[in-house]
Curated annotation (Swiss-Prot):
Protein localization: Cytoplasm
InterPro entries: Ald_DH/histidinol_DH, Ald_DH_C, Ald_DH_N, G-glutamylP_reductase_CS, Glu-5-SA_DH, GPR_dom
Associated pathway: Amino-acid biosynthesis; L-proline biosynthesis; L-glutamate 5-semialdehyde from L-glutamate: step 2/2
Main localization (coarse): cytoplasm
Keyword Cytoplasm assigned: yes
EC number: 1.2.1.41
GO CC, alphabetical: cytoplasm
Recorded superkingdom: Bacteria
Enzyme class: oxidoreductase
Name used for this protein in its record: Gamma-glutamyl phosphate reductase
MF GO annotations: glutamate-5-semialdehyde dehydrogenase activity; NADP binding
Amino acid sequence: MNTNIANQLRAAKKATTDLNLIQSDTRTIILKTLAANLEKHIENIIQENQKDLSLMLEQDPRYDRLLLNKERILSLVNDVRKVANLPNPLGVNLFEKSMPNGLSIKKITVPLGVIAVIYESRPNVTIDIFSLCFKSGNVCILKGGKEAHFTNSYLLLLIKNTLKNFNINTDIVCLLPPERALMTQLLNATGLVDLCIPRGSQNLINFVRDNAKIPVIETGAGIVHTYFDKSGDLGKGKKIINNAKTRRVSVCNALDTLIIHADRLKDLPELVETLSQKNVIIYADQDAYHVLDKNYPEQLLIKAKPQDFGHEFLDYKLAIKTVPNIKAAIDHIQQFSSHHSEAVIAEDESAIDKFLTEVDAAAVYANASTAFTDGGEFGLGAEIGISTQKVHARGPMGLEALTSYKWVIRGTGQIRD
């Protein structure tokens, strides 16, 4: 292992003791101070962000994720304040029992320890991760992408300056160099890192899962479907589909495939009408193509190929699949889903119940946009990632997901027979 990286990880592990000694009220004050510092230095953050943006083509799908403007920074500041004001997740009593032999047994929440997060493009993640880890008593190792190097480095400087003002050990957070070659060393850091969370492309997530010797929670990649049922309301459908697809195409909760009941194909042109205003390219199956031909801009309509389904576009592109019934819709989702976010638009309660019960995803929606799959929108303040697995955490991961528990047993000299 690279000596410098090894030293950083050892220092981070050692710093867990110092972090555990910081009282909850102090952690809250420090986070509020960080929020104020971020707000104070908005122009400097934008300047550093522009350095990163200048090295990327504006047409690159990552460009929007990399961009930090005043509005996004203020939203980030607000998220930090929300996290600061959340209840302390540590020391929560999950179970308590007095045994017949006099033993008192409790199960209480504790930090996970050292959390490494590997992420791409989005520098706002740097602040989200630190605020959640700090509030939950976890040391964080940040491994951002080279495309956000200037922005991440400046954000880390603001974090460390805030900690120094409170005489806090700054080893509780570190930003590793962006070189990809260092990733394997991090993934092999058994005994130093307690959990790794990859946030980014499917290729990144696959690499981490396949090469890690430390525990991993998979997050990110979203192959998202919305099913418009036979009973779907046209007005709701138009708004939901447009929002889920075009609000922010570069995020993991953006719509990738619209599934439509065959009996509602006549309404398809109206359902997707507003998408043409955003130049959304539609990859339509045979039935959908036949209906949209002459009813959607010719240059934006393409006959779908098999590979267009089960694809995370992260762009102004949408696949459309026609099905004869809700069972076929669910079967299609189960075949291609990444188990992130899936939605149904329906008025028939039995159809809604069937969809919400049978679809296997971290977040399932009825008559709402999948754009809501987000820690802030779920009342978590922020998120460290959106887990697409079932063990330990699932869906947006807030403070609770960053804790484990330990058993505390008090006795008066008891021994076991």
